[in-house]
């Protein structure tokens, strides 16, 4: 053990001796109380409870003894989660030493720690004195993730949770991290970002969630439900939903299943078109209810065609569509050949080469379809 005066003390030790034991041996030899001793090896201050083996101190190693002026000081370290750690330090401690103390208390490896004081990031080799850090100063600890990032999760109670994540983490992974921190089972968590409910199998990158983004956590009452969505082609989609889901959420689920952008979806229930900001509960949509999905064409419109049997067909059309085009769409839906179709609007039979615009047929107009018997004239 080498002192600052240059004197070297020789000690007989075991690898299993703790730093406390070593300080007691130095007290026996030199009369220096352990609480005034700081031992340094390989640039690191040695912590009392650790053993020589922990620091890989082998035979004939040299430790450096620095006297601790009575009266170290306390400083505080505040993390992004709002937790405050209290540390016992000396002005002569290096930033490395401080990070080692934080590791001992919190288990965070020094290479993942960034310490900030007065807006400056602190460099490892410098001392607290170099930065004029005095007793009861507060440092801020920011985690440096290997290739990772931090995001925030805000709960309905207003509490904000900080999570360490990677862009490649799935929403399932994020829910598991929230469970670790908050104890909320993943199946009760709904995460919302940019107004969209996040689906389990997708990644943060899929939703363009970047560092320091804020997600919103909504608790899912146990017991979601299934509803059905019927498309104009007759296909039925089954969705897992909550009563508290908004119509936007439902459209996002339909997009995930069918690839149809929400802005092209119109949902109808009990004859009413559903508005995006409202919830299923607002419309009294219960388990196993069936919604109807109508596609809203960009720049297009819907018209209705009523048959003599009273059936109404919905068509997606453009004003520039010709009557021929419309008959072809009816054939696609109903299988009726165009040459057997007669279309009537406002009491007039529509001629094939003309357009809907020519007849001032606008969105949600109703045409009447009369069948022309073969061999008629």
Curated annotation (Swiss-Prot):
Keywords: Cytoplasm, Isopeptide bond, Nucleus, Repeat, Ubl conjugation
Pfam families: ubiquitin (PF00240)
Placement of covalent cross-link Glycyl lysine isopeptide (Lys-Gly) (interchain with G-Cter in ubiquitin): 120
TM region(s), chain numbering: none
GO molecular function: mRNA binding
GO cellular component: cytoplasm; nucleus
Positions annotated as propeptide: 377
Crosslinked positions (Glycyl lysine isopeptide (Gly-Lys) (interchain with K-? in acceptor proteins)): 148
Localization, UniProt: Cytoplasm; Nucleus
InterPro entries registered for this protein in UniProt: Ubiquitin-like_dom (IPR000626), Ubiquitin-like_domsf (IPR029071), Ubiquitin_CS (IPR019954), Ubiquitin_dom (IPR019956), Ubiquitin_ubiquitin-like (IPR050158)
UniProt domain Ubiquitin-like: residue ranges: 1-72, 73-148, 149-224, 225-300, 301-376
PROSITE patterns given in the database record: UBIQUITIN_1, UBIQUITIN_2
Similarity-based family: Belongs to the ubiquitin family.
Function summary: Ubiquitin exists either covalently attached to another protein, or free (unanchored). When covalently bound, it is conjugated to target proteins via an isopeptide bond either as a monomer (monoubiquitin), a polymer linked via different Lys residues of the ubiquitin (polyubiquitin chains) or a linear polymer linked via the initiator Met of the ubiquitin (linear polyubiquitin chains).
PANTHER family in UniProt: UBIQUITIN (PTHR10666)
Other remarks on this protein: Ubiquitin is generally synthesized as a polyubiquitin precursor with tandem head to tail repeats. Often, there is one to three additional amino acids after the last repeat, removed in the mature protein. Alternatively, ubiquitin extension protein is synthesized as a single copy of ubiquitin fused to a ribosomal protein (either L40 or S27A) or to an ubiquitin-related protein (either RUB1 or RUB2). Following translation, extension protein is cleaved from ubiquitin. For the sake of clarity sequence features are annotated only for the first chain, and are not repeated for each of the following chains.
Protein name per its UniProtKB record: Polyubiquitin
Organism: Nicotiana sylvestris (Wood tobacco)
Gene name of the record: UBI4
């Amino acid at each position: 053990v080498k002192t600052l005066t240059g004197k070297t003390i020789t000690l007989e030790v075991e690898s299993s001796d703790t730093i406390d034991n070593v300080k007691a041996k130095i007290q026996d030899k030199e009369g220096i109380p352990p609480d005034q001793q700081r031992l340094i090896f390989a640039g690191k201050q040695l912590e009392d409870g650790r053993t020589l083996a922990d620091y890989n101190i082998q035979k004939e190693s040299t430790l450096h003894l620095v006297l601790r002026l009575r009266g170290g000081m306390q400083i505080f370290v505040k993390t992004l989660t709002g937790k405050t750690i209290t540390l016992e330090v000396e002005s002569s401690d290096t930033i490395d030493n401080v990070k080692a103390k934080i590791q001992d208390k919190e288990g965070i490896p020094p290479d993942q720690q960034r310490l900030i004081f007065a807006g400056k990031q602190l460099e490892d080799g410098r001392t607290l004195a170099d930065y004029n850090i005095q007793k009861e100063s507060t440092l801020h600890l920011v985690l440096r993730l290997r290739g990772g990032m931090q995001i925030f999760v805000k709960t309905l109670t207003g509490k904000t949770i900080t999570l360490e994540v990677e862009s490649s983490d799935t929403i399932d992974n994020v829910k598991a991290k929230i469970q670790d921190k908050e104890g909320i089972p993943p199946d009760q968590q709904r995460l919302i970002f940019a107004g969209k409910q996040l689906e389990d199998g997708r990644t943060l990158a899929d939703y363009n969630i970047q560092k320091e983004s804020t997600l919103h956590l909504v608790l899912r009452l146990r017991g979601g439900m299934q509803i059905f969505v019927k498309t104009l082609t007759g296909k039925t989609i089954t969705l897992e939903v909550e009563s508290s889901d908004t119509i936007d959420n439902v459209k996002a689920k339909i997009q995930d299943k069918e690839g149809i952008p929400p802005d092209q979806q119109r949902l109808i229930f009990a004859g009413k078109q559903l508005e995006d900001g409202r919830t299923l509960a607002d419309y009294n949509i219960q388990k196993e209810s069936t919604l109807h999905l109508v596609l809203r064409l960009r720049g297009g419109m819907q018209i209705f065609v009523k048959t003599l049997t009273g059936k109404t067909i919905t068509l997606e059309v453009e004003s520039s569509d010709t009557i021929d085009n419309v008959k072809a769409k009816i054939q696609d839906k109903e299988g009726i050949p165009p040459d057997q179709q007669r279309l009537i609007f406002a009491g007039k039979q529509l001629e094939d080469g003309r357009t809907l615009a020519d007849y001032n047929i606008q969105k949600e107009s109703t045409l009447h379809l009369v069948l022309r018997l073969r061999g008629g004239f």
